[in-house]
Amino acid sequence: MSQIIGHISQVIGPVVDVYFEGKGIDTDLLLPSIHDALTIKRNDGRILVVEVQQHIGEDTVRTVAMDSTDGLQRGMEVIPTGHPITMPVGNQIKGRLMNVVGEAVDGMRPLSKEGAFPIHREPPKFDELSTVQEVLFTGIKVIDLLEPYSKGGKIGLFGGAGVGKTVLIMELINNIAKKHNGFSVFAGVGERTREGNDLLREMIESGVIRYGEEFKKSMEEGHWDLSKVDYNEVEKSQATLVYGQMNEPPGARSSIALSGLTVAESFRDRKNGDSNGPRDILFFIDNIFRFTQAGSEVSALLGRMPSAVGYQPTLATEMGQMQERITSTKNGSITSVQAVYVPADDLTDPAPATTFTHLDATTVLSRKITELGIYPAVDPLESTSRILDPLIVGQEHYDVAQRVKQILQRNKELQDIISILGMDELSDEDRQTVNRARRVQRFLSQPFAVAEQFTGVPGVMVSIEDTIKGFKMILDGEVDYLPEQAFLNVGTIEEAIEKGKKLLDAASHKK
C-alpha cells in the first residue's frame, strides 16, 4: 500500500488539519499513522514538521505543529514521511545543540539522519532491565549525605520560582562531567531562552562542551565566531543539548522531553562493537512541569475534556510512557534529574504529584531556606531517597544522616518556643541541640563552581568521606567553640575550622 500527498484544510493556531483527497475512494491508499511526521514546505522554502495526533473520518488527520504556523494557507501540499520524528545519533551529536525535530540550531554544520532513532519508542523489555543498586556521588554535601542519588534512578528537584533549580542542575552537570567523566544530555523543556544561552556558554567555559581553544579565546574576547570551531574537539564534548524554549508552540514543548530522552537512549543502547560511546548517561530535564503544561495545551487544542485543575485527562499516561523509558538496562544506564516547578509552592497540584510517583529520590528546594541565605536551598527534612539504606550506603553514612535529620527536626519543633519565650527559656540540652542544629544547617551550604561569577567564592566538590566526617564532628560537639558563621559556604570541616579561627582572631582584635 502506498502513501498519498495531502493538503491543508484548516489551521487553528498550532493545530493543522490535513485532507487526503481520494482516500475514501481508493482503499489501497493509507492515511499516515498516529505520531507520524508530515512535512509542509512554506512559501519561503523552510520546512515545517507537523505530527499526526488524530484521524478524523476516513480522509482527514489532525496534526500539531512543531514550529510556528504563521504563513500557512489552505490548500498547501503536505508530504507524509512514513515515520515518526527522528533524532540523529552517534558522535556527531556530541557537543551540539538541537531542536525538537533533530535539526542543529547552533549555527554549525548540519547533522546526518543516518540510523536516526524515532522519538516514540517502546520502553525496554522486563528481561533487559538491570537491578544493580549503586550510589552516584555528586560532590554536593546535602545531596550525598541525606538524599543520595541512585545510578540509573530518577531524581526530582522540586521548588517554586527562583529557588535555584537550574543552578543546581548546572552544578550537577559540571560535577559529574569532572568527577565521573560522565556524559550528559540536557533537555530544556519550555524554559527561558536566556537560561539556555547561559548554559551553553557555561558548558563551553567549563570544558564540558569543547569548541576548541581558538573559539574559546574569541569567546573570552566577546566574539562568537563559529568559523573557529574545531569539529574534532566538538566530538570530545561530554554533553548534548536539546532545546524547546517557552516561545515554541505547545507541540514542540510537549515532544522535546521525548527528543532529549531519545538522544540519551541512543548513547545507552549503542552496539557492542562501538566502544567510543558513553554507556552511563545523565539525562537532565528542565522543566518537567512544562512538559505537563504543554500536554495540557495540546489536549485542549484537540478538544479533549480537561480533568482536575484543567490538566489533560491523559496526564498520568503521558508521564508514565516517558518515565518508563528512563531506566537502566544491561547495556548501560540513564540517570535522570528532573527539575519540577511547583505551582504556587503547592506539592498537591496534579502535575508535581503525578511526577512524585515515578521518582527514586526527591530534592525539595525551599523558599524558607533561601531566606536564611543558605544555598543550595535544599530542605533536608522534606527531601527523600529510596537508597538511604545501611545495606547500600553503609552503616556509618546511614547513622550520621539519621542523626542530622533528628537534630534538625528537634530544632524545628523548638522554634515555636524560641519565637515566643526566647533561647533563655530552653533547657541546657535543648540549647545545645539548637546551637548544633544551626551549625549543621549552615554546613549543608556549599559554594558552587557555576555560581562563582556571582559569589566570588570558588566552587568545591566534597567527597562523601569528608562529608560524613564533618557532620559527625559537629554532632559530637567537637567544633562547638567555633562561631556559626564559620560553617556557612565552606566545603570540608577543615575549611570551616580555618574560617572559624580567623573569625575568632578578628573578634579578639576588635576587643
From Swiss-Prot:
GO MF, any single term: proton-transporting ATP synthase activity, rotational mechanism
Catalytic activity annotation: ATP + H2O + 4 H(+)(in) = ADP + phosphate + 5 H(+)(out)
Keyword Transport recorded: yes
Pfam families documented for this protein: ATP-synt_ab, ATP-synt_ab_N, ATP-synt_VA_C
Subcellular location: Cell inner membrane
Gene3D superfamilies, alphabetized: 2.40.10.170, Bovine Mitochondrial F1-atpase, Atp Synthase Beta Chain, Chain D, domain 3, P-loop containing nucleotide triphosphate hydrolases
Record keyword Chloroplast present: no
Keywords in alphabetical order: ATP synthesis, ATP-binding, Cell inner membrane, Cell membrane, CF(1), Hydrogen ion transport, Ion transport, Membrane, Nucleotide-binding, Translocase, Transport
Protein name: ATP synthase subunit beta
Native source species: Phocaeicola vulgatus (strain ATCC 8482 / DSM 1447 / JCM 5826 / CCUG 4940 / NBRC 14291 / NCTC 11154)
Gene: atpD
